[in-house]
Amino acid sequence: MANSSLLRVVLVALLLLGSVTVSAGDGRGTPIAFQAEVSKMLDILVNSLYTNRAVFLRELISNGSDALDKIRVLYLTSPKEPLTKDGEAPTMDLRISFDKEKSELILRDGGVGMTKEELAKHLGSLGTSGTKHFLEKLQEGVGAGGGDQNNLIGQFGVGFYSVFLVGDRVRVASKSDDSDEQYVWESKGDGQYFLYPDPRGNTLGRGTEITIELKPDAEQFLSAETIKKTIHQYSEFINFPIYVQEEVEVASTAATPEPAAEEGSLDEGAVEEDPDKEGDTQGVVKERRWTLVNENRPIWTRPIGNVTEEEYHTFYKAFSGDYRDPLYFNHFKVEGEVDFDSILFVPTTVDPASFSDDNSVPNTNIKLYVRRVFITDEFRDLLPRYLNFVKGIVDSNDLPLNVSREVLQESRILRVIKKKLVRKTLSMFADIAAQDEAIANGKQVESPAPSGHTHLKKPAYTKFWELYGKHLRLGVMLDSNNRNRLTKLFRYKSSRSESEYISLQTYVDRMKKGQKGIYYLSGDSVARIKKSPVLEDAVNHDVEVIFMTDAIDEYVVSQLTDFAGKKLINLAKEGVQLEESDARQRVADRKRKEKYDSFFTHLRALFGYSEVRKVILTKRMTNEAFLVSSGENQITARLASIMRGQSMSLANQQMTAERVLEVNYRHPLVDEMFKRFTVDEDDEVATDIAWVLYDTANLQAEFPVADVAAYSKRINRLLRSSVDLSADDSLLPPDDAEYTVSDTEAEEEEEQPKVDANADEEAEAVGEDDL
């Protein structure tokens, strides 16, 4: 689409090259006509770049702001004091007014203005060499004028012609310090324009006034509310004040109001009388007043350190619509390969939409500005998906302004901004953690000076992690370039820190001497993990274990294999040995394995070769007879369970979660089974014991039990056997004979109304809830 837009613009520029003169005799001078297809080409031009007609106002305000920027720079070295013919000085602002009777919208700025030659150059010909330069810069991804402030000229380029989206006729009056005369450029967008001295004389002193005769279907732009809404959307943070003239009803007074100053020279809050105003019977009159619209100044352009925390909070609420203060903010400026200003905020609540996996939905939390002009908030990857909860603004002078979103999306500059923005965002999170640690160590600064970021008054990282930890863990899977930065931000509870989170670095710092790696267990909750038999082994060895309680952790550890040079080890995997064996122990282990080899072969045959990959002697210090672990290079039982819950198509995924049976030879039941199976491989008691222990171990490890009914029957048989009851003993006979019921009692019972027992239970439950 971007190439298509470029092709159209190139075609327009080529067709508009060269102009011809035709005669006219209406007093406006000689009209200048472009080639015959100009109207069609202009239509292609504006519609190829703009789909929303309201952007014409953004373009004109941006042009006016550039013109004011230019004159401000020029006056730093060569100040002047121009005046209108009535002796009024032009103002350094933009003003928008209306003539509803004529359906005219009027925009005026006190900027640099244009001479007759500049009007012809910038408005009269799209086919100049400037257009070629514009197209070249467009292709390079650099906007005309770039980041050089001396090029901040109020030249009307491609964007100006968006005015014909809403206007039937446009008149541009302009006065430059370089000319004694004020000129008017006028066109209906029909292939020709007029250029003539303004018959009104010097009404501007300096600057430009654009009068748009609105199309019948664009008269909504005669509404002050519509104009203000559009300004808030696109031009809220323009460097200069923007005033809109409004009609307000005020109580009439006996005193005669002073004559209003000429339009464009009024101060904020000044009153301009409607010459045709009439008081009603209740003493109310209509007056015209200038209303300042863009009261929220672009605080990101102010020096970092000169903005208070309260101002940042106020700004956040204004631009985000969130009524809460942000959890954290960071204001920074990037210079070098690309220059931009940015303020990023971390909200105090999670937007459920941030967990959406629909990549076609743009992230609208980051608003992109170019020279303080809002461009778009619909980039899908200005920040990666895992950081889509961060809100903020980015303002760059190095991006092109008047191009489509598709062209910007491919911009090299935008890719650089994205890379730096991600680094700054992760640095912001690290700062929250660092301040947390400082507070914990008693190093909190009581009354810090403004520094462009939040100064925490109390710990906040725990809340941040609980809100956005899932997002950061997703980042480990999606952003390999920043994986190390992300893992430093991770926080977990552990067997030594069940109530407070610790970082992986903290875990590493307090590892036992000689410890092989970072041990962890995953589960639905800390309470469930604490009941795991494999945790018992770590506790017995005084080894700390990380508790991972979020489903996403299982996916994360598949990507995150180590941290700070220490391997991450899942205690639920086979063959975990927390202490090294000496030579004597290794020899004994080999002999022990030979002793139990036939026993293990029998167990594997009993439970099924397809279900149990292998049977081994456990090296864990545990009181359990059997442990079921996952294969070393296989997915865990928990991950398989999570995958089954996420998609029915993965219902058979459990087959890849291979089971390893670990046998504790020191357990009395294991010793009894070994003896019984050595005598008789079909021993029923030993078989029942083996199955019950195996199924129980499966449940503890979150593997499913294949035959729950058989499991229940085996437990029943073992319980009968433990109290010397035969498995064949049937139920006892009914004991009705023990209870004597008289005929009278039976008759009385028959006469009682029948009551639904379930209804009684439900009624009791409701009553308990009420209590």
UniProtKB/Swiss-Prot annotation:
Listed binding positions for ATP are: N63, D109, F160
Q: Does the keyword Signal belong to this entry?
A: yes
Signal peptide interval:
1-24
The yes or no answer to whether the keyword Nucleotide-binding is present is yes
Q: Which SUPFAM superfamilies match?
A: ATPase domain of HSP90 chaperone/DNA topoisomerase II/histidine kinase, HSP90 C-terminal domain, Ribosomal protein S5 domain 2-like
* Annotated Pfam families: HATPase_c_3, HSP90
Q: Compositionally biased, Acidic residues: which spans?
A: 260-277, 758-771
- One of the record's GO molecular function terms: ATP-dependent protein folding chaperone
Compartment annotation: Endoplasmic reticulum
This protein's GO CC annotations = endoplasmic reticulum
Record site feature (Important for ATP hydrolysis), residues = R405
Q: Which family does it belong to?
A: Belongs to the heat shock protein 90 family.
Its quaternary structure?
Answer: Homotetramer.
This chain's function reads: Molecular chaperone that functions in the processing and transport of secreted proteins. Required for the synthesis of lipophosphoglycan (LPG), a cell surface glycoconjugate. Necessary for the attachment of the galactosyl residue to the mannose within the phosphoglycan repeats of the nascent LPG chain. Also required for addition of phosphoglycan to acid phosphatase. Not required for normal growth. Has ATPase activity. Binds heparin with micromolar affinity which may facilitate infection of host cells.
Something else the entry says is:
Prominent antigen during human and canine visceral leishmaniasis.
Q: What protein am I looking at?
A: Endoplasmin homolog
Source organism per UniProt: Leishmania infantum
